[in-house]
């Protein structure tokens, strides 16, 4: 499992190529950025997981939350078989007000992923019980199908 946390696309491509060269089955996780960066990352071959698109410092719009994803990005992720991951450890470290905003953004992302049939998972996977993961997804308005897919 390789986690890449940079905003330079050429550096991301180089790290993916290096990781895939040493181990072709390596899981590549990329930390999300703004929407344009996320779109370019979702178009790169070899990416497996986009981590925490909801975590950013941009303000929400008046009528809509800025959750880091939109319907086009979700369709692109679904087409390229890329999973969207929610970083639970980062969510637990937030203060109450910021945690509420982030949870609202996660709910919006779950709805978008449900509509476009994009797989959503929790990160890190090994740390939590399967029943807890399924419960978390369903509490945040995910379908039971999404909850089952999140533990596989």
Residue ranges and their predicted role:
Residues 33:
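Divalent metal-binding segments
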Residues 1-27, 36-152:
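Charged catalytic cores and adjacent phosphate/nucleic-acid-binding surfaces used
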Residues 30:
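Active-site histidine-anchored catalytic micro-motif
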């Amino acid at each position: 499992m390789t986690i890449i946390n940079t905003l330079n696309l050429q550096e991301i491509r180089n790290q993916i190529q290096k990781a895939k060269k040493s181990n072709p089955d390596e899981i590549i996780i990329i930390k999300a950025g703004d929407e344009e960066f996320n779109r370019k990352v979702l178009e790169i071959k070899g990416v497996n997981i986009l981590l925490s698109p909801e975590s950013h410092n941009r303000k929400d719009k008046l009528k809509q939350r800025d959750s880091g994803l939109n319907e086009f990005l979700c369709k692109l992720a679904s087409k390229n078989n890329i999973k969207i991951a929610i970083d639970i450890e980062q969510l637990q470290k937030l203060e109450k007000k910021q945690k509420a905003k982030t949870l609202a953004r996660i709910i919006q992302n779950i709805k978008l992923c449900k509509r476009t049939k994009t797989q959503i998972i929790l990160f890190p996977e090994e740390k939590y019980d399967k029943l807890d993961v399924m419960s978390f997804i369903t509490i945040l308005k995910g379908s039971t199908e999404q909850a089952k897919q999140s533990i596989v």
